[in-house]
């Protein structure tokens, strides 16, 4: 029954890191306009590319990730290799859940053609989510770092993981396409 003192972020002493966003003030505005803008941002972010050799984002990231998995056996640093792969997989899995729920929520709010495209986009993200759930079973994130983590780096797991990642790109492309179609319908609604 007693409120606890908040712990400053720099004294959490937690493994890894915690990220959270909090908004004090409620955003005011036209809900439909805000929803459309959120969908525009989602489609834009999902479509991003980056023209350098160090960082890969957007659709190309799935191919790059699948190819990079082949290098896991030779990477001795946990976070640069196996652990980083597992951590990123958890983040991608969670983002696909959020994308699915976001599009489902919008599809319930806005009937007609917009709803159909949003539902179809949600289905694509749901398929990605299922694939990432399978991927994270193959490459589970564990903390603290397991002493025997090198035993987890097995060729058959790497091949299966790469196969899963290569299935992601066409689903992502389809989801982006559906979001853009929903936005086109928004203009004529």
Locate each region found by the language model:
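Noncatalytic regulatory segments and standalone regulatory/sensor domains
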Residues: 1-108
């Amino acid at each position: 029954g007693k409120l606890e003192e908040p712990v400053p972020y720099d004294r959490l002493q937690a493994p890894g890191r915690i990220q959270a966003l909090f908004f004090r003030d409620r955003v005011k505005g036209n809900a439909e306009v805000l929803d459309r803008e959120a969908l525009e941002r989602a489609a834009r972010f999902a479509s991003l590319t980056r023209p350098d050799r160090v960082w890969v984002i957007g659709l190309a990231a799935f191919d790059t990730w699948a190819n990079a998995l082949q290098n896991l056996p030779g990477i001795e640093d946990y976070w640069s290799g196996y652990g980083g792969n597992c951590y990123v997989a958890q983040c991608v899995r969670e983002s696909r859940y959020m994308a699915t729920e976001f599009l489902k929520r919008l599809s319930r709010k806005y009937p007609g053609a917009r709803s159909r495209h949003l539902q179809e986009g949600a289905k694509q993200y749901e398929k990605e989510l299922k694939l990432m759930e399978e991927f994270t079973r193959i490459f589970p994130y564990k903390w603290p770092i397991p002493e025997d983590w090198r035993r987890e780096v097995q060729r058959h797991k790497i091949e299966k993981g790469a196969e899963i990642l290569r299935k992601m790109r066409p689903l992502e492309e389809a989801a982006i396409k559906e979001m853009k179609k929903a936005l086109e319908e928004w203009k004529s609604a």
